[in-house]
Amino acid sequence: MVPGSVFHSKMSRKLNIAIVGLGFGAEFIPIYQRHPQANMYAICQRSKEKLDAVGQAFGVEKRYQSFEDLIRDPKVDAVHINSPIHLHASQSIAALRAGKHVACTVPACTTIEEAREIVKASKESGKKYMMMETVVWSREYLYVRELRDTGRLGRIQFVRGSHLQNMDGWPGYWEGLPPMHYATHCVSPCLGIVNGEAEYVSCLGSGRISEARIAKYGSPFSFETAHFKVRNQDVAGEVTRYLFEAARQYQESFDCYGSQTSFEWQLTEHDDPVLHVGGEKVEKVKIPDYAHLLPEAIREFTTKCVYDLAENAHLSFIQGSGHGGSHPHLAHEFVTAVLENRPSFPDVHQSVNWTMVGILAHESALRAGEKMHLPNFRGV
């Protein structure tokens, strides 16, 4: 059985969810409100004006401006963190240590030590941690997973991902960010589809961004492209990432090459992916929706934006073509993993490994492609 794919109606307990950060995070409010096993208990936002506006719009009465006050609330079972990148790890660790289950938007962390502390806090608290990686719950990924599970792919031989996105117009902390520091959208499907974690990575940077952007993080590269080896497997993968100063339509792509069938993502938006069958047969495919894997009450959220649909849907949702219908799958996976007391997909070890690929890939690029080994925190 696929984890979280079937709703168990016998479960009667509801999980009290608190959402932290109400930009992208507000997308999940109605999903939790309608999930049969969740209670959308509280929201948290520093801006009181925004906090009250969102709270009134969705009828959420429990509101916090202080994250510290929120995690002290004994009624909060789990927090879903959607704050700026530099806060992800510290807030996740604090929430775990406060006895809360944690779902956190990507990336999980920005340093190897933060990764270690997330794993340690999850283990010591006994609470679940799940990085809310959209791509591994997108309809495209679920389609390739189905090809894998039914044996149509054959033996997986190679995986490749790319995330090409011009971040002009995003909040200032994105300016000059090392490309591989936000690489989970291309790394995660490559490792997820082989049920693996990376052992080591080598990366090269390419091109140069403006001096003003370089000054922010000390990263000169427009592009970074990395190869990684999957631990305890004979599979390797390649990922490419850029953030600024290149002409390219937005693309999050994932290719999977099998001995019998291979899947290649479409080159442009609104085109269809391609299947290569047996080497010579090529066919375009229409990707089905996978809402049937969800409780009926939240199925419609695979195909529509749920927050301020008319004007102000979050930019990541617009540019990412709705994140492949992943949002209700992510919420359902998190809720059911906690209530069933099972590992989520991704679990804490997968979450930090997939994030560390990008962290160490950038370090490798600064060292002209030096091979970087990823620590294995399963013994922490």
Where are these predicted regions, by residue range?
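C-terminal capping/lid region of NAD(P)-dependent oxidoreductase domains
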Residues: 127, 154, 363-380
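Rossmann-like NAD(P)H-binding beta-loop-alpha module
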Residues: 139-167, 173
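Conserved SAM-binding strand-loop segment of SAM-dependent methyltransferases
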Residues: 60-67
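Beta-strand-loop-alpha-helix segment that lines the small-molecule cofactor/substrate pocket
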Residues: 78-85, 89-136, 151
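Rossmann-like dinucleotide-binding domain that binds NAD(P)(H)
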Residues: 168-251, 255, 349
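NAD(P)-dependent dehydrogenase/reductase Rossmann-like domain
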Residues: 2-15, 264, 347, 370, ...
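C-terminal glycine/acidic-rich active-site capping loop/insertion
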Residues: 221, 229-232, 260-345, 380
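N-terminal Rossmann-like dinucleotide-binding module
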Residues: 2-58
